């Protein structure tokens, strides 16, 4: 039963992406991106709903052309979560999705075109209260910066970002967030560190093109974990070559591990060894699958033997320690003994009961003011 995070977050300006606050004292938002064909409205809406069910706060949708812009407008009417339109090159697409109710525009002012085109996009955003995300990526740096630095570097990423920030500053537009992404962890981390010292706008964190489910999760956890532990970051996206729902799950797991957000169960489980008194791996796999629907924050310990079991179980809302028989702890106190027969069924029942009690207790606390 872990407490508040010891992390002191960087001070930043608060903006709003739809009804979701980003920056300032707002919780760190978890974002993902659809990988469907945007013109396939039904498929895109279906995927967005799955992301919402997983707890996503903001969803980005690619809008490569005017047909996709019209489809985006239909999608926007069918979902409740804030949508970011990802736009490059054609400023008219940005103007159209602004008319259709987009919640945020992801652009690079540098590839939108002439000053008058950037001004038109900024004016449309200002008139409708739409924030902008400046997205700098190591794979698409401006040619002059590639020539100046020879290759992508943290300094090159930051110079590109500040160039775009100054562009918006000249237009007196401050409702924006910035990202400086790279696939190399050290490059991305250093770029964000440098940028965090130079602007007050919120930062959107990500390790771009991180990889598949396993490798991308590791890269993102290492890179974003370093930054978040230093208080840097206001919204995150875990870029995975996998089902976007996995991005949301990994994002919450990273935030939970740093006590920055709580959603669903935080499992503490041993890797198992020959001392285990029940099949820890099988038990964990079954519990994770069965309890995905629980949103209430709970610490659940599943430890196979008595070496570390009692200590871990006492720190959890619900803890299981392997033994003969196994022992269940509730709120740090021994509660009942269980055999291996129907172990998962009984444990699931106890966890759900504890979750219901916590919801009731939290509601009573809120009611008392």
UniProtKB/Swiss-Prot annotation:
Protein keywords: 4Fe-4S, Iron, Iron-sulfur, Isoprene biosynthesis, Metal-binding, Oxidoreductase
Documented EC number(s):
1.17.7.3
Enumerate the cofactors the protein uses: [4Fe-4S] cluster
The free-text note explaining how the cofactor binds reads: Binds 1 [4Fe-4S] cluster.
Q: Which reactions fall under this protein's catalytic activity?
A: (2E)-4-hydroxy-3-methylbut-2-enyl diphosphate + oxidized [flavodoxin] + H2O + 2 H(+) = 2-C-methyl-D-erythritol 2,4-cyclic diphosphate + reduced [flavodoxin]
Cited Pfam families: GcpE (PF04551)
Q: From which organism does this entry originate?
A: Pseudomonas putida (strain W619)
Q: Any idea what this protein is called?
A: 4-hydroxy-3-methylbut-2-en-1-yl diphosphate synthase (flavodoxin)
Q: Which family does it belong to?
A: Belongs to the IspG family.
Residues annotated for [4Fe-4S] cluster binding in this entry:
270, 273, 305, 312
């Amino acid at each position: 039963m872990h407490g508040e995070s010891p992390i002191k977050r960087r001070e930043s300006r608060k903006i709003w992406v739809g009804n979701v606050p980003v920056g300032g004292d707002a919780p760190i938002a978890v974002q993902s991106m659809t990988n469907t064909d945007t013109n396939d409205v039904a498929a895109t809406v279906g995927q967005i709903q799955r992301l919402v069910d997983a707890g996503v706060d903001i969803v980005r949708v690619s809008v490569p052309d005017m047909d996709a812009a019209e489809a985006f407008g239909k999608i926007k009417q069918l979902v409740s979560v804030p949508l970011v339109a990802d736009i490059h090159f054609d400023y008219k697409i940005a103007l159209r999705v602004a008319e259709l109710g987009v919640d945020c525009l992801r652009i690079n002012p540098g590839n939108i075109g002439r000053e008058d085109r950037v001004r038109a996009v900024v004016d449309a955003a200002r008139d409708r209260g739409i924030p902008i995300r400046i997205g700098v990526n190591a794979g698409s740096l401006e040619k002059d910066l590639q020539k100046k630095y020879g290759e992508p570097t943290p300094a090159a990423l930051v110079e590109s970002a500040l160039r775009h920030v100054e562009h918006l500053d000249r237009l007196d537009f401050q409702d924006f967030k910035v990202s400086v992404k790279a696939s190399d962890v050290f490059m991305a981390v250093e770029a964000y560190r440098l940028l965090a010292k130079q602007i007050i706008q919120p930062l959107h964190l990500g390790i771009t093109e991180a990889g598949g489910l396993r490798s991308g999760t590791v890269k993102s956890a290492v890179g974003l974990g370093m930054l978040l532990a230093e208080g840097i970051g206001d919204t995150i996206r875990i870029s995975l070559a996998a089902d976007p729902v996995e991005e949301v799950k990994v994002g919450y797991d990273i935030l939970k591990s740093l006590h920055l957000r709580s959603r669903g169960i935080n499992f503490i489980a041993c890797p198992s060894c020959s001392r285990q008194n029940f099949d820890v791996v099988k038990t964990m796999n079954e519990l994770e699958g069965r309890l995905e629907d629980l949103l209430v924050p709970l610490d659940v310990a599943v430890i196979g033997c008595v070496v570390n079991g009692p200590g871990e179980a006492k720190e959890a809302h619900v803890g299981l320690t392997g033994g003969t028989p196994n022992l269940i702890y509730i709120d740090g106190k021994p509660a009942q003994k269980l055999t291996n027969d129907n172990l998962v069924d009984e444990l699931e029942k106890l966890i759900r009961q504890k979750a219901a009690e916590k919801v009731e207790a939290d509601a009573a606390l809120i009611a008392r003011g």
